[in-house]
Structure formats: C-alpha cells, structure tokens
C-alpha cells in the first residue's frame, strides 16, 4: 500500500509558492498531511490564498478544519521525516524572501482585477492618517486657539444679553400696558368714546398703501435673480453683442476679461521683451543642447502600455499598485519609470494631478527590492517644499510599499525631534523630508548620516530652486555624495540651465509631458472682473460666490496669512464652516485643518500658497482665487488642486485692474490649449449687500481678534511657567545637552524668508521709499539722456559767472548800507 500512497502525494520538487489550479482537488483527494501543512502556512502568509480559501465551498472548509485538528492531535508522527525537513526548508526560504511568494511560473500573469482588488482602496487620496494623529499628539505642541470656540462663546454671551434685554422690555411693556389700561378706565368713566381700529382690516386690497410689502419682496427677488452667472464661452459671447443694454454690459464684461485687450504699456514692453527673449532663447537652446542628454525615441505610441505589468516590475510592487487602484500608468509614469530604473538623472514635468509622485516612487521601490539587506542603510532622500506635501508623499509611498520590506521615515517640522532621531537610528531605506528639518538632523543627530545616499528626489523642484530655498538646498547638495541619481519633478519646471547646474545633474534626461504650462482639460476657468474703484468690495464678491454659487468642497487662496485669518473669522460669524491653512499655524493645527476639509466637516479651506503645490485632496470641486497670484506659474499650481486624475473641476478668479497681466497670460494659455474659459457676472448691488454685512461685523471681528490674542498670550505664559518648572527639576540634564547648530545666522534666515516672500507675492509695499527732489532730478536727467533729448548744458564759465555777480552785488549792497548809516548819524 505504500506505493499507492506515494502516487497520490504531490512531489515536493514540483511545489512552488504560486497559485495552483488544482489546489482544491489536492485537498479533496486527501493529500499528504505534511504537504497540506505547507499549503496552510503559505495560505496564512499570503492574502490572496486567504481570499481563495475563503471563497471555497463550506464543505471543503470543514474538511480543512478536520485536517488541521488531526494534525494538531497527531503532530509530526504521521508525516515523514523527509517531509518535515522539506517544510522547514520552505519556511526558511519564505522567511528570507519576506512577503514575496518565491519564484514565479514562466506563464504566470498577475491578475490586477478579481481577487487582487479585493482590498482595493477606493478613491485613494494620500491623506489617510496611519500614525499622523498619534505623532501629532506626542509632539508636545501647545494647545491651539480655536476660533470657533471664541465665536460660539461670544454668541452665547450675546444671546444671554439679548434674553435679559427682552425680559426687561417685556416687563416695561407690561408696566406701560397696565398704566394704559388704568388711563383707559379713567377715560371711559368720564364718558369719552373709544376708537376702534379693527375696521382697518376691511380695507380693499387695492387701496392706497396696500401691497407695499409684496412689491419690496418682488424687487428683492428680481435683484437676487439678476445676480446670476454668465458662463458662456468666448465664442458665444461675441454673438450676443446685439440686444438690450443689459446684454451689452454683460458682453462687455465678458470681452474685457476673457478677451484680453492690449494695453499700450504692455505692447511696448512686449516688443522690447520679444527681441531680448529671442537672443536669450538662442543662448539657452545651445546650453540645453549641451546640458541635457538626448531623449530616447521609442517606436511605441504613448498609449501602447496599458498596464504596469509591461514594465517588468516585481510582484510586490504590482500588488501595492493594485491595492491603491493604480492600473494604467499615466503619460509621465510611462516615460519616467523605464528611465529611472536605468539609474539616469531626470528632469520631469507634467500637469498637476498626473501622478508624478508615483512616477518616482515606483522605480525607487523596484530598485530597493534588490538592495543588500545585511546592513541597514539609508539610500534615498525625497525633499519637499512644504510639510503637508511631505506627509502626503509619505502616505502614498507607504501604501505602495505595503507588500515589501522597504522602511520609510518622514522628517517634517512640527513633530518631535526625539522620535525622529529614534527612527533614524534604525537607518530607514527612504527619508521623506523638508529641507529645514533634514539639515537640522544632518548637523545635530549623531545617528544620521548622508554618506550612503544613492538617490535624491526634488519634488516641486522649481520652488526648491527659488531664492527662498537656495541656501538650504546648497547646504544639502554640498554634503551628500556627488555620485548619485538625481530626479527633479514639477508641473512648471524651470528651463534655466544655470539653476539646474546647481543641483549637480549629470547629463539628465528631460521628460516633458504637456510642457507648455497647460491646465487640465477637465478644468473650467472663470473670471469675475472688479471695476476700478470697487476693489474694496472684493470680500463681498467672495461671500456671494461662497454662499450662493460654490457651496461645498472649495479651496480659497489668499496672498497673505493675515487676510486669510480675517476672512476665516468672517466666515465663522456668518455661519459658513471653514478651516484655514497657512504658515502661522502649528503643525497639529495644519494637519487638523486638512483632515477636517478632507472628511467634509468644513466646506471651505482658506489657504495661502502653502497649499498651492502638490496637495492632493479627493473631491475638491472648486478653487477660488481671492486675488490673482503674482505669476502665471503660481496660478497653474493653485487651479491644479481641482480637476485632478481625470475628474472635472472649476476655478474662479476675482480679478481687478492690477491683476490684468496674470489674467491675460492665463486666458492666452487657455485659448491656445483649447480649455474652457468663461466670464461670471455678479451684480454690484448683491456684492454691496454682502460688503455691508461685513462692515456691520467690523466691531465683532476686532473683538474676536483681541480675545484670540489674549488667549495666545495666556498660552505663552503657561508655556514659560512650564519651561521654568522643567529647568528647576531637570536643569542639569537640560544644560548638559549639546546646543543645536545651524548653518545660517538669524540675519541670513530673515533675508532668505524675505526673498521667498518676494518670489510669491512680489516686492513689499513697505520697501517703497519716497524719492527726494535730488533723486527725482537725477532720474529725469537719465531719462532725457536715454531718450536723446539732451539739451544745452552750462559750461565752466557760465557756472562761475553767477557766483562772481553775487559777490559783486554783495559788496555794492554793503557799501550802500554803510553810506545810509553814516547819513543817519549826521
């Protein structure tokens, strides 16, 4: 009977860690218990095996349970010694390979759908908190001042005061009524006739003064209806010029915004700039030809690769991509992944929301799967300009690396330094950081070394190359090894070779997808024009748009933190749920604001340009620019927060006369691209009503700001008290710690911050100084010389002649005075 038992068993040599087509048949035929034990162990280590066994019929599950119970009872006595050795070897191989299932069958094809997508995250947006809340709570940030609490507290106080006033009014009315009744009784007793006013109810409906309320209400409704929007394209607007006066006004508004009218100054400047740009372009073209490596021309069409399987990626990477529902690579991913796997330097550019993060994370993970594992080493550094972007990239990367053994660490300001140092001691494979915190650990953390870095990624590289980050980036680039792979990505990548040379690129490959600074084709761009003299009513226009037109999932961008905070208070007083996001907030507050907006707790996110780059929040329907940004590049990043990953979106810009250049550039680029551009007309009367509401709340806004400032001072005082107590208790330990160093002085840091603010918002108005008359004259003279109107100029003789005349005249006058004095004495 022994030979028959051998025939029914599955040969050990043929067993591989893949999905077997006859797996269930083996279980039904009563396979060898040692082999089934190996099957059970691999099923527990693989999620796909779990899903397949879960979908098997109930009878088979019962049989498997019986087999497990029999194995527990009998142990290894039933299985042969050879089978035990084979099982131990298989377990060791599975442990060494991590979560990889071993060798693949040559004809095996990874199934992206079906069982593999059972754990798919629908609508993955990169902001699912894994350990962000815990780390935020542990970082020791002081308790933030909540504007909503202040507003609700003041509202309760006002309601209480109003109730007290109403009670007093009721008492006073009762007293007056009692007095009136007493007087009426006295009058009746005197025999006077009473006047009955109830006959007024029998007046005709068309009598004088009747229906006045209805006319007012109809007028208000008509005004409300008139505050609609004209969302027709430019081609439709040109055909509506003939009509009533209202139509003419609307058409003029549309043409003035959607169709840019050439300004004389702009035309002169454009002519001068065109000649200069032609010379610069020729020089830059020669530099680029020598600097960039030639892009490899492929015979395949861009849409030929329909799946990530065509890149020959490892199975754990494919499983991670399927878990976040990434099935078809985007154009930038199709171009980047093959080149990045070869280890070449890359300068990549694509429109917002095109998957640039996955374009560099996927090849990094693929290369790290083949790294030496004996000694833990940090090999990759990914630098981001903002904390929110670093947290988002960390979440995306960890999701994609779920089925691998690659470790990550995020070095972001606002979190605990001690916890980050403890993680750095374990030498994580990938470090995702902001430049400031990266330099802090690089100089002050003894367990952190950058000598082993092999890959450097700069996301939003054009922002990182600006003056605000120049010093920090130079400090990092001069410290890390020069023999590295460097990848730069941005939606508005700079073409300046001089800036790219600073990064230390080695014959980079330039991968440009939609390199003409285009927007998404699913984005509709709207413009609301403010006539000259109505710039002060800008907030009224914003409140009308947010309360009547765009009521949910809206990001509003501001240039200044102060303005964003003030509008946040106005929204709270008017009952609009909003959160703010800017640099004056703590990291805990910033993450809380993004989470509240992502989860739908608030409908509006009031942000500065801190949130304009890279922030990917699912379901953002509208982006409103409270005022146009400083440049067209910043405008592209702002409006790129919506209409991402194939979804539709809308961008609305409130533009005044100073914003004419940016609007003109946006309209020109949109027309060249064929994007949807429309004009929205808001009735001035409606905007004035909302502006009047804001003016009525000015005192309340100031009171809220004062109370908030008082609470901040109280929190700072409490923090100072706690700091003093800690110094008294642990003074020796605190003073023994080495002082943290930085590569810049305080003056240099202030100068770099000032340069960064100038890049975003232009030169500050405070820097403008009134010219003296001497400076004005000097400028006028230089202008005249430049125009060729140099007139006659005095020579040496002409300049000396007035001086001689003055001296002679002075002597004559003194002689006359002396003669007059002598005459007076005589």
Swiss-Prot record:
Residues 128-138 have a biased composition (Polar residues). One of its GO terms (cellular component) is preribosome, large subunit precursor. Residues 538-690 form the Helicase C-terminal domain. It catalyses: ATP + H2O = ADP + phosphate + H(+). Residues 59-74 have a biased composition (Basic residues). Associates with pre-ribosomal particles. The Q motif is unique to and characteristic of the DEAD box family of RNA helicases and controls ATP binding and hydrolysis. Belongs to the DEAD box helicase family. DDX27/DRS1 subfamily. This is ATP-dependent RNA helicase drs1. It comes from Aspergillus clavatus (strain ATCC 1007 / CBS 513.65 / DSM 816 / NCTC 3887 / NRRL 1 / QM 1276 / 107). The lineage of its organism: Eukaryota, Fungi, Dikarya, Ascomycota, Pezizomycotina.
